[in-house]
Amino acid sequence: IKKLSRKEKSLIVEIHSSLMGYKLGSSICCSGICLTVTSKNKNTFKADISYETMNKTNAKYWKVGKKINLEKSLKVGDEISGHFVFGHIDTTCSVEELYKVGSSWFLSFKFPKNLKKFIVQKGSISLNGISLTINEVKSNKCHCMIIPHTYKYTDIHTYKKNEILNLEVDMLARYAHSSNS
């Protein structure tokens, strides 16, 4: 993050980016949050973060210099690797544990109990925009195993105990639950 500017109850963020091929109005997933490019230069872009988004996400804790995950939106015909991540954050969660197991990493986190109906073993979840497979769920805590590539090329390697992450439940789980209600 290059710059943060408060504007009433919202925020304007300027982000260094090596992403290519985006334009004004493009949606970019920023640590899991779908943000719209409102201006851009060669190596940076700006986006507005609304009051609602500030309240629902960890953006309120962002600081200049923080490294965040960035990903452009898919286009029809693009490969889908992982699950559908929309950038519509449900809530935040907190890191419980992160430690190495063999060549992988064990990550556990707590989530609000009202989301348990969408979080299932071997289902998908997005943390800070990273598509992950849920290994186990117990009460309002679950864990995922992180492969070395994901650990190295995302912000997971920076996580500390109690760090606040953006959580988006799997939209297919949400729709499946909705159709059964």
Residue ranges and their predicted role:
Residues 1-181:
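Conserved loop->alpha-helix
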